[in-house]
């Protein structure tokens, strides 16, 4: 199995969140999802708020929520530099659902005092956290 794996490293400003061999990954690119496997062509891509999905070297499907950043694929390794990232198994789902509800309420209000772009991003982050916490199919 090792011959079909490559290194994934997920880094935030605070820490290295993940570093291990994986079989494949799907990242939320700005213009759609980006699938990466071993021997992928070199690539640098901007990432959107969303769910990063990957399969470990032992075949376990995992998810993490990321809130944008960049991804570099080079020499059979992938490095994700994320503004924030959180393992799906560590997400407080109740807190994420509450954040989603708050953002939706902010977006319903038509007021110059509400920063709608910021509320939309908060909603996207909450949805990504909820989706990352769900069990893979």
Swiss-Prot record:
Pfam families: ATP-synt_DE, ATP-synt_DE_N. One of its GO terms (cellular component) is proton-transporting ATP synthase complex. It is found in: Cell membrane. It is a peripheral membrane protein. Keywords: ATP synthesis, Cell membrane, CF(1), Hydrogen ion transport, Ion transport, Membrane, Transport. Its main location: membrane. GO terms for molecular function: ATP binding; proton-transporting ATP synthase activity, rotational mechanism. Belongs to the ATPase epsilon chain family. Produces ATP from ADP in the presence of a proton gradient across the membrane. F-type ATPases have 2 components, CF(1) - the catalytic core - and CF(0) - the membrane proton channel. CF(1) has five subunits: alpha(3), beta(3), gamma(1), delta(1), epsilon(1). CF(0) has three main subunits: a, b and c. This is ATP synthase epsilon chain. It comes from Syntrophomonas wolfei subsp. wolfei (strain DSM 2245B / Goettingen).
């Amino acid at each position: 199995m090792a011959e079909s794996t490559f290194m994934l490293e997920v880094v935030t400003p605070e820490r290295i969140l993940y570093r291990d061999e994986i079989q494949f990954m799907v990242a939320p690119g700005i213009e759609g999802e980006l699938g990466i496997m071993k021997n992928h062509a070199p690539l640098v891509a901007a990432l959107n708020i969303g769910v990063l999905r990957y399969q470990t070297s032992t075949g376990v499907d995992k998810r993490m929520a990321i809130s944008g950043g960049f991804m570099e694929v080079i020499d059979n390794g992938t490095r994700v530099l994320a503004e924030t990232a959180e393992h799906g198994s560590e997400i407080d789902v109740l807190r994420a659902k509450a954040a989603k509800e708050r953002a939706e309420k902010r977006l319903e209000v038509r007021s110059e005092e509400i920063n709608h772009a910021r509320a939309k991003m908060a909603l996207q982050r909450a949805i990504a956290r909820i989706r990352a916490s769900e069990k893979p199919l």
